[in-house]
Regions:
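Juxtamembrane intracellular "pre-TM" segments in multi-pass secondary transporters
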Residues: 1, 179-209
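Short amphipathic helix-loop junctions that connect adjacent transmembrane helices
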Residues: 25-37, 223-243
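Paired small-residue
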Residues: 81, 92-100, 286, 297-305
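Intracellular juxtamembrane helix-capping segments at the cytosolic ends
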Residues: 108-120, 312-325
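C-terminal membrane-cytosol helix-exit motif in multi-pass small-molecule transporters
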Residues: 165-184, 375-383
Length: 386
């Protein structure tokens, strides 16, 4: 079990590192190809649209097929598309490659989480899923820092080559070390449940709605955060270096990662619902602080408030999904839960791309906070009425 968890952590870390590496440069890359703000939002949504389409299908398939082999396919897609990014010649080609990137994510991340959830002992779901979330946020946190540095020191293409090399390493270790799931007695195969059955579970449905709204709010602002930090004052930006944007994004994600395991232990000991509600309120407050930040430290502090809220809520939320998934089917449950994020990440950037053109860059952060607050309130009432 120990070696399996290690490999799963590495797979998730590498996949999310690749995503994090390109996050501070993708809007700039698209802008260099002549993309508008709305197209930049659409580019972010391409990744999530792909995940929304393929994640539930892969989740159901994983109930009766080898998760190890499917994960290897997903990592291979990641590796290839990383190189293809450097060959983009216009917005349409970049959009297509972003869509393929989402396919790799749809295969890799939910299956790694489902595999880890199946290995989690009862009563330690928060600890195990907090550890997996640590890997996710560590990759996303270090990625922008590396991506910003490589862009400033080398070129816009350099981060994509690094992303491909890291994914190739993860793929190799998956094939060599990760055991076949069917060889483990602790993992039971079952027929794939329907999506309707999964969503008919009231507690899971409340978690699903919270995740949709959380991703909606996050997607509305986070994709434009690098533009807010490094963009010119004419568009409402702060005019800082790309590496500074990468640093702020990284500190936010790394701090979130560092809090995942202790907050996971907290989720195993205390009321998970209350932790989710408190986390949602904190994150919404952080979004509202961003447009009032003018220095590096002020932006950093607002980002840390968002990170603390997200870190508090996520282990408790994924622990609930794990517990309910044992009865429903972990592969399908994790995939549907991941689809919730995709729905929000599709709508969020599209809405923000439109609103930035209408109301300005800075006001979009208030919109993101309001959306996150709405999701928190919706979760509270849905959980009470179940």
């Amino acid at each position: 079990m120990f070696h399996a968890i290690q490999v799963l952590l590495l797979c998730v870390f590498t996949a999310m590192l690749g995503l994090g590496i390109v996050s501070p440069i993708m809007p700039l890359y698209a802008e260099s190809l002549g993309a508008t703000f709305i197209q930049i939002g659409l580019l972010s949504s391409a990744w999530s649209i792909s995940r929304l389409i393929f994640t539930p299908v892969i989740g159901r398939l994983s109930e009766t097929r080898s998760k190890r082999k499917l994960m290897a396919v997903g990592l291979a897609v990641y590796m290839v598309v990383s190189i293809l990014y450097t060959l983009a010649w216009d917005f349409t080609s970049l959009f297509s490659m972003r869509f393929l990137h989402g396919l790799g994510s749809a295969i890799t991340i939910p299956l790694a989480l489902a595999y880890a959830a199946a290995l989690a002992p009862e009563g330690k779901e928060g600890r195990y899923m907090g550890t997996m979330n640590l890997s996710i946020f560590s990759g996303m946190g270090l990625g922008p820092l590396i991506g910003g540095y490589l862009t400033d020191e080398f070129s816009l293409s350099a981060p994509f080559y690094v992303m491909s090399a890291m994914t190739a390493l993860s793929l190799l270790l998956t094939l060599i070390i990760l055991p076949e799931e069917k060889s483990r007695s602790s993992i039971v195969r079952r027929s794939a449940p329907s999506f309707r059955k999964v969503l008919s579970n009231k507690l899971f449905r409340a978690a699903f709605v919270y995740r949709v709204m959380d991703a909606f709010g996050r997607g509305s602002v986070m994709y434009f955060l690098s533009i807010f930090i490094s963009g010119s004052s004419e568009i409402g930006g702060l005019g800082m270096a790309v590496s500074v944007a990468g640093l702020i994004l990284s500190v936010g994600q790394i701090s979130m990662a560092a809090m995942q395991r202790p907050f996971g232990v907290l989720a195993d000991r205390y009321n998970k619902v209350r932790l989710i509600l408190l986390g949602g309120l904190l994150a919404a407050t952080g979004y509202a602080l961003l447009p009032n930040a003018y220095t590096v430290w002020e932006v950093m502090m607002a980002r840390l408030v968002i990170s603390t809220g997200a870190a508090l809520a996520m282990p408790a939320l994924t622990a609930i999904v794990t517990i309910e998934g044992r009865e429903l089917g972990l592969g399908t449950t994790m995939s549907v839960f991941q689809s919730a994020m995709s729905i929000g990440m599709i709508a969020g950037p599209l809405l923000s791309g439109l609103l930035v053109d209408l109301i300005g860059l800075q006001r979009i952060f208030y919109v993101g906070g309001l959306i996150g607050l709405t999701g928190t309130v919706a979760f509270y009432f849905m959980e009470r009425l179940r």
